[in-house]
């Protein structure tokens, strides 16, 4: 079966009250439209066609890199009119799958079933029963249960509005009859629009069987029209992600307080994740990784046995096995920690590599640096990497000991097994195996008295 996925994404989304097109709002870190595109890609369709409209330049700027055919709907006159814009991309022998850019939770298995029901004499239609069907087109069946037509709510009679089975808008149909029915669409309805749903009655009139498929859960076909619905779908999505991770062996201390806004590309055994953790981008977690509360990770690789303690922020970093990071640590992009490294509280590491067993435990900034094996960096150490024009590197060789409150003014090299005395400002390379310090000699002044404050005269005096 040759399938063309047609994603309708031209709606303005006025109820979002946003300058951003509705389909560019995000769930799970991805635009609504990108969720739908990924579904089409997973189905291995021959071509994906995206019909866009409101905020078209923004949509193309954000997602124009996707390998899809983009077609503009300059005047928005309904779903039937949107499909008409793509008619030149529809082959007679192809199966057209109509999806919506604001329905992001649809499952691949559901759509595969729908496609299976579309054939030479049948039209596949995705419907769902809702306790509150307000706002949806109703599925009208005859006494034997055969689908006859779809009636939009504004055009429905009171009896038809009582029907709980509704149209999701998602359907699959062969190209040749679809093109024929599109030509016959009329806009003589309450909205003055061309309804794609009208093709159902045309199909029935020609003897086609309407094969209605139901999703596993109504959540799959929920759309986004306002911020409240966006938040509701975000929670539904995150519940699914949390359940999937627990099924893969992850311990989540509270699944309701975990957000995955990307994908875990590698997952080891016995991973534990505490509350209020956010994972973004591509994340790799090795065996027995422990992630503490209130941690943010983005595009990060974490080796086995690593502990990331509370309130740490890590982005674009690689952390070697058995390392310990935090609490309140920050690793910025292109930071690479080897095995057994310790990064402690209120330490920031930026674009630096730190070799096996080295420790930066307290209140330090390590930027544009290379730190060797077994190095101890004392509290309050700063690599002064920026001269106002360019960044420069600091190199600390194996076994060095950096005393507290040290400034290393780059470019500078600290030699192997060197010791830097506390409170030093190092501006030149230091030799191996010796003590280097640059602080002024301590002086005690005997008999010195602290100045006294002038005594204020009272009013009585």
Curated annotation (Swiss-Prot):
GO CC terms: cytoplasm; membrane
A molecular function GO annotation: glucosamine-1-phosphate N-acetyltransferase activity
Q: How does it assemble?
A: Homotrimer.
Family note: In the N-terminal section; belongs to the N-acetylglucosamine-1-phosphate uridyltransferase family.
Q: Which reaction does it catalyse?
A: alpha-D-glucosamine 1-phosphate + acetyl-CoA = N-acetyl-alpha-D-glucosamine 1-phosphate + CoA + H(+); N-acetyl-alpha-D-glucosamine 1-phosphate + UTP + H(+) = UDP-N-acetyl-alpha-D-glucosamine + diphosphate
List the pathway annotation: Nucleotide-sugar biosynthesis; UDP-N-acetyl-alpha-D-glucosamine biosynthesis; N-acetyl-alpha-D-glucosamine 1-phosphate from alpha-D-glucosamine 6-phosphate (route II): step 2/2; Nucleotide-sugar biosynthesis; UDP-N-acetyl-alpha-D-glucosamine biosynthesis; UDP-N-acetyl-alpha-D-glucosamine from N-acetyl-alpha-D-glucosamine 1-phosphate: step 1/1; Bacterial outer membrane biogenesis; LPS lipid A biosynthesis
- Under Enzyme Commission nomenclature, its number is 2.7.7.23, 2.3.1.157
Active-site residues are: 362
UniProt gene name: glmU
Record field: transmembrane: none
Tell me the superkingdom of the source.
Answer: Bacteria
Q: What cofactor is this protein dependent on?
A: Mg(2+)
Q: What is this protein called?
A: Bifunctional protein GlmU
Give the residue ranges for region: N-acetyltransferase: 249-461
Q: Name one GO biological process term.
A: cell morphogenesis
Main location as per UniProt: cytoplasm
* Gene3D superfamilies reported in the protein's UniProt record: Hexapeptide repeat proteins, Spore Coat Polysaccharide Biosynthesis Protein SpsA, Chain A
For binding acetyl-CoA, which residues are annotated in this chain's numbering? 379, 385-386, 404, 422, 439
InterPro entries, sorted: Bifunctional_GlmU, GlmU-like, GlmU_C_LbH, Hexapep, Hexapep_transf_CS, MobA-like_NTP_Trfase, Nucleotide-diphossugar_trans, Trimer_LpxA-like_sf
Enzyme class, spelled out = transferase
């Amino acid at each position: 079966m040759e399938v063309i996925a047609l994603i309708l994404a031209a709606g303005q989304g006025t109820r979002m009250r946003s300058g951003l097109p509705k389909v560019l709002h995000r769930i799970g870190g991805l635009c609504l439209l990108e969720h739908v595109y990924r579904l089409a890609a997973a189905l291995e369709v021959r071509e994906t066609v995206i019909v866009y409209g409101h905020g078209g330049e923004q949509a193309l700027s954000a997602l124009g890199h996707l390998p899809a055919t983009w077609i503009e709907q300059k005047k928005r006159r309904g779903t039937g009119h949107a499909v008409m814009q793509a008619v030149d991309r529809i082959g007679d022998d192809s199966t057209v799958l109509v999806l919506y850019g604001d329905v992001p939770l649809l499952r691949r298995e559901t759509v595969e079933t729908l496609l299976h029901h579309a054939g030479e004499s049948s039209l596949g239609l995705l419907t769902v029963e809702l306790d509150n069907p307000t706002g949806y087109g109703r599925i009208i069946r005859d006494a034997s249960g055969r689908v006859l037509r779809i009636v939009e709510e504004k055009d429905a009679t009171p009896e038809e509005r009582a029907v709980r089975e509704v149209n999701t808008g998602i359907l699959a149909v062969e190209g040749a009859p679809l093109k024929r029915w599109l030509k016959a669409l009329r806009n003589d309805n309450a909205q003055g629009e061309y309804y794609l749903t009208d093709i159902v009655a045309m199909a029935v009139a020609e003897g086609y069987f309407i094969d209605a498929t139901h999703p596993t859960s109504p959540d799959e076909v929920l759309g986004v029209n306002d911020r409240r619905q966006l938040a509701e779908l975000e929670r539904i999505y995150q519940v699914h992600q949390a359940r999937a991770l627990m099924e893969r062996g992850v311990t989540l201390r509270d699944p309701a307080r975990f957000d995955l806004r990307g994908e875990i590309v590698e997952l080891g055994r016995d991973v534990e994740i505490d509350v209020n953790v956010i994972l973004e981008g591509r994340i790799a977690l090795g065996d027995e990784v422990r992630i503490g509360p209130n941690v943010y990770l983005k595009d990060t690789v974490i080796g086995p046995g690593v502990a990331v303690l509370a309130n740490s922020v890590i982005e674009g970093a690689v952390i070697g096995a058995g390392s310990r990071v935090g609490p309140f640590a920050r690793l910025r992009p292109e930071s690479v920690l080897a095995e057994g490294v310790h990064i402690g509280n209120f330490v920031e590491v930026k674009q630096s590599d730190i070799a096996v067993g080295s420790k930066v435990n307290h209140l330090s900034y390590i930027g544009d640096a290379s730190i060797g094996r077994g190095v101890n960096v004392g509290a309050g150490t700063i690599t002064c990497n920026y001269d106002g024009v360019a960044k420069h590197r600091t190199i600390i060789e194996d076994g060095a000991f950096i005393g507290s409150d040290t400034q290393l003014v780059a470019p500078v090299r600290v030699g192997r097994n060197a010791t830097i005395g506390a409170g030093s400002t190092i501006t030149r390379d230091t030799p191996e195996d010796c003590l280097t310090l640059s602080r002024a000699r301590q002086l005690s002044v005997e008999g010195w008295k602290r100045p006294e404050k002038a005594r204020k005269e009272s009013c009585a005096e």
